[in-house]
Each structure stands twice: as structure tokens, then as C-alpha cells.
């Protein structure tokens, strides 16, 4: 390719020529970078086949075929999705089994009731009191039933194209109009793609969750768990069914005299603290008088208001945080081993950053190991360093951070100072910005000299 011709076309605004050259840009290094950072090209899926068809060289095509990547879900980047998938696959604390033409599927009544009005009705009528439910109808395909369960639990579905019609039939029976629409839309996409790209083979349809609907419906279980006297003001969802379906609780948490009817599957799956607590606690525990089969566990050192915030996080991966409660929730999240809730608190604290609290926020981030919040604090410090160096508390923080470095020598670096210097000098591109950065660095160096530190 003539580089001069390309540059001339760019200057002239010859878009058609630039587009022609761009189609030749098959950079193998870029493909490797994308794959290493979570991009995926799954064989026999619609998106995967489209990606393979569009490969610009044989080397890239081979790279896509041979790359054994761990997907974002397998790497547990989204802990909530991973928890729900594990709950489905392992069936821990399941309270119902479906037998479909010789195949057994473990499930949880609470999840199916929250996600489907059809299952809610069936559990209270035809299937009431049954722990093993045989589904003998010849048109019920086990693979399609498994895909429907996957959709209930995760909002996602992976289904062989040969089973799509079976899935749609089941979805119709379960009154899942939205799922039918999604399947038909995806089938149309695949048909149009395969028609225009001969030689491609799509064997698996994948539906990805495109909204928070399944989280909102799981939050109904938190609504149900609330004691009647505390329900006013909480759990106000657009389509509130909490008065119309039982949630089948198997554990009662008593907090400040209030009884929260919950599920071991969620609390044990979300928190190792509760997992250990519930597995070790009940040899001769207290039982509820109204529900003799439900054990009671009294939780101390937490207010019922903060427990409610934890409750909604456990069920829906989200909760309402405010400047008034975020520090208390953060302490509870740390104590109950809920790293996702800690990160949620970190995001809320980051929105509260100001000159008056940045030093306290940095200490909080260090204490609770919130690396993202810690970095945001040092970035904020870099912006106001000329005023910050005048505060004795800031000098004390630097001394303390220097003292935390094991076997530190006089000229060794100090993590806090290094991070501030990085943010001062990053993205400096103009002469005026360089001058401003130098003034800030001089102010920081002068403070270090005053307190007798070098780094």
C-alpha cells in the first residue's frame, strides 16, 4: 500500500479511498490484545460466525479458532451472575426437583416464583407440597427446559438452534411473551446473516440480559423478607407482587426484634460469613412459632436499617446508599465478607469527594482496601496539592505511609507521594500544563523536605 496515497486521500477528504484501505487493516496484534482483555469469538454462535467471516487474514482466523479464552463470566467479573449460575448448576439448598424424561433439574421455589407468575400459581395449586415434580408431556424437551431455567436464574439463555421451537413452546406455556419476542428477533438476525454469508454455520443461539429485569424481580424476595411493620417505604417496585406469592423462606434472621424471612441459598451463596454461620449454628437452634420448620438466627451489632440495605444487596446486587448510611454499610460489608457491596459503597463515597473530606476518604479506602476509591482520592489530591501541603494532617499521612513501607531506606519511594506525582504529571501536553505541574511538584517536594523525607 502506498502510504503517501493514503495520507493524500485523508487530507483531501476522500472517504471512499480511506474506507478501501481500512478494509485491509488486519492487525493480528490488535486481535490478540482484544482477546486477552475479554473479547470472545465463540464457534457456532451468531456473533462468533460473523466475526470469523469478517476476518481479514488466515492468521487472524486461526488465532480466533485456537484461542482458548476464559470469558468474562467464567472469570467471575460479575459476581452476581456467577452466583446465580452456580446456584442453578449446583442446586445448593434447592427445595424442588423437576423430572423431565429421565433428566433431573434442581431448582428453588423462591427464584421461580419471583421470575414467573405461572410457576407461582402452579406451586400453590397443582404442585403444592411436592418436592419432586415429573413433567411427562412428550413435547417438553429436557434441553429446552434447562434453557428456560437458565433464563429464569441468570436472564441469559444458550440454546441449540434445533431446540428453539421447543423453547418457544415452553415459553408460551409459562406465559413469557418477552422471551418469545427475543427468540424470534434473534432467529431473524441469524437467518439474515446466514443468507448473506454462505458457508457459515450457526448452531447456538445466545440471549444476553439487556436490562435489570431479573435483578428487579429478585428484589421482590427482599420485599417479601421484610417484616410487615417495616414494609412501608421499602420495596416499592413498578409491578409489586409480594402480597400475591409466598417466597418459601427457610431461615429467619432476627435483628433488633424484627424477623426477616430469608433464604439460605442466597445468604450462603453470597457471603462466606453467613455460609459458615449457618452451617455451624443449627444443632439445637430456636425455631419460629408461626413456622416451626424455620430456624431463627439472631444477628447482633447491626441495626435493622442497615440490615435492610444488606438484604437488598444480597438478593438483587444493588441497594440504596446515602451519605448518612454508606459508612455503616461499608463496615457491615467488610464484616460479612461482601466485596461487591464494599465496591458499591466505594462508588458512593467517590461521589462525595471534596477538599474537606479527601484525606479521610483516602484513609477509609486504605483501611477497607478499596483500590479504585484510593486512586480517585490521590487524583483529587493532585488537583489541590498546593492547598493540601499546608495541612498538618496531610504531612502526618505521608509520614505514616512512609513508616508502613517495610525496611524503608531514606531514598525509597512512598506510595502516597508516588501516586500523587503520577496524577500531577499524567496527561500533561501543553507548556502551560507543564508549568502548572512543576509548581505542584515543587510544593510537594518542599513539604517532603520540611518533614525530613526524600523519595
Named regions from a protein language model:
Residues 17, 29-30, 60-63, 118, ...:
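Conserved ankyrin/ankyrin-like repeat signature
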Residues 20, 32-40, 66-69:
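Ankyrin repeat domain, specifically the short helix-to-loop turn at the C-terminus of the second helix
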Residues 61-107, 152-162, 185, 189-264, ...:
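N-terminal BTB/POZ boundary and linker segment
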Residues 99, 104-106, 111-177, 248-261, ...:
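Canonical BTB/POZ domain core
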Residues 155-216, 317-395:
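Post-BTB helical module
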